[in-house]
């Protein structure tokens, strides 16, 4: 079941400028935005947003890094460093970039923990386990605080997102989907 029956975010065809309208093209797929100009027929596919995250291990004790968010959604709640992948950016490079931007750390990606997606939610979240190789723990303008936590100190009741909780549990349980490429 698809939940794409909201008001379309785009109203005009990017090719010819004619209005777009939602239409069912295949019974097994959600409605697509289609150009009303029959000679154009452009189909606008609304792709999901892709986000990456890194659960960063620091030191021999295996402490992990969490960042307290300074933005909504989840203001004041804890997450691992992460964010959106830019168009054309490699997933692994986005994960490295986000670790540097949000926590001030250069990391080595060790393995893919999992990919998280939820019905009716736009982002698909790709989460890696990583090890700090250099840098000083710091936050950017999207964070209030960055901190190291022992695994038994994780503030479970103050985590920002379902994907944060699920990825941390998978990390602690040792679930590994694949080596990082």
Report residues per predicted region:
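Conserved hydrophobic "DFG−1" position in protein kinase catalytic cores
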Residues: 56-57, 66, 130, 148
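Conserved Nudix-box catalytic region and its N-terminal flanking loop in Nudix hydrolases
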Residues: 2-3, 58-101
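NUDIX/MutT-family hydrolases
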Residues: 139-168
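Acidic, metal-coordinating catalytic segment for phosphate/diphosphate chemistry
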Residues: 5-54
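A short coil-to-beta-strand element that immediately follows conserved catalytic motifs
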Residues: 24, 106-113
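A broadly conserved sequence feature marking short terminus-proximal activation segments
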Residues: 1-12, 54, 170-177, 181
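Active-site-adjacent beta-strand/loop module that shapes the phosphate/pyrophosphate-binding cleft
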Residues: 116-137, 147, 167, 172-175
């Amino acid at each position: 079941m698809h939940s794409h029956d909201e008001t379309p975010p785009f109203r005009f065809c990017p090719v010819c400028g004619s209005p777009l309208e939602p239409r069912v093209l295949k019974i097994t797929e959600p409605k697509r935005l289609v150009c009303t100009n029959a000679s154009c027929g452009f189909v606008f596919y609304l792709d999901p947003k892709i986000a990456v995250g890194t659960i960063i291990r620091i030191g021999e004790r295996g402490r992990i890094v969490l960042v307290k968010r300074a933005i909504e959604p989840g203001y004041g709640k804890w997450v691992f460093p992460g964010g959106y992948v830019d168009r054309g950016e490699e997933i692994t490079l986005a994960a490295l970039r986000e670790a540097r931007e949000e926590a001030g750390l250069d990391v080595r990606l060790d393995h893919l923990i999992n990919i998280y997606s939820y019905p009716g939610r736009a982002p698909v979240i790709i989460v890696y386990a990583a090890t700090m190789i250099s840098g000083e723990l710091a936050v950017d303008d999207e964070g209030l605080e960055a901190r190291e936590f022992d695994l038994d100190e994780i503030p479970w009741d103050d985590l920002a997102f379902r994907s944060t909780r699920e990825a941390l549990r998978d990390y602690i349980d040792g679930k590994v989907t694949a080596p990082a490429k």
